[in-house]
Amino acid sequence: MSITAEKKQEVIQSNARAEGDTGSPEVQVAILTSRIQTLTEHFKSHHKDNHSRRGLLMMVNKRRSLLDYLKKKDVERYNALIQKLGLRK
């Protein structure tokens, strides 16, 4: 249900603002998005797994709050990130 270390490093490198950046909101949102997508696939075959569903909802809420923070601080970075990750239609 979690993402592999290689996948996580790939996500970090593709969204980092600078070398070694792991804490910026963009990277955190990208990692959460990857984990959310993995859990969404998990629920297609395990629809009664309510314990993991709670974790999914917490991740979605954390991502939402990080996106709200980024939108408040820098709208251009926010728009670029949601475009890159395909979060809005």
Swiss-Prot record:
One of its GO terms (cellular component) is cytosolic small ribosomal subunit. Residues 1-10 have a biased composition (Basic and acidic residues). Keywords: Ribonucleoprotein, Ribosomal protein, RNA-binding, rRNA-binding. One of its GO terms (molecular function) is structural constituent of ribosome. Residues 1-24 are annotated as: Disordered. InterPro entries: Ribosomal_uS15 (IPR000589), Ribosomal_uS15_bac-type (IPR005290), uS15_NS1_RNA-bd_sf (IPR009068). Transmembrane segments: none annotated. One of its GO terms (biological process) is translation. Part of the 30S ribosomal subunit. Forms a bridge to the 50S subunit in the 70S ribosome, contacting the 23S rRNA. One of the primary rRNA binding proteins, it binds directly to 16S rRNA where it helps nucleate assembly of the platform of the 30S subunit by binding and bridging several RNA helices of the 16S rRNA. Forms an intersubunit bridge (bridge B4) with the 23S rRNA of the 50S subunit in the ribosome. Belongs to the universal ribosomal protein uS15 family. HAMAP family: Ribosomal_uS15_B (MF_01343_B). NCBIfam families: S15_bact (TIGR00952). This is Small ribosomal subunit protein uS15. It comes from Novosphingobium aromaticivorans (strain ATCC 700278 / DSM 12444 / CCUG 56034 / CIP 105152 / NBRC 16084 / F199). The gene is rpsO.
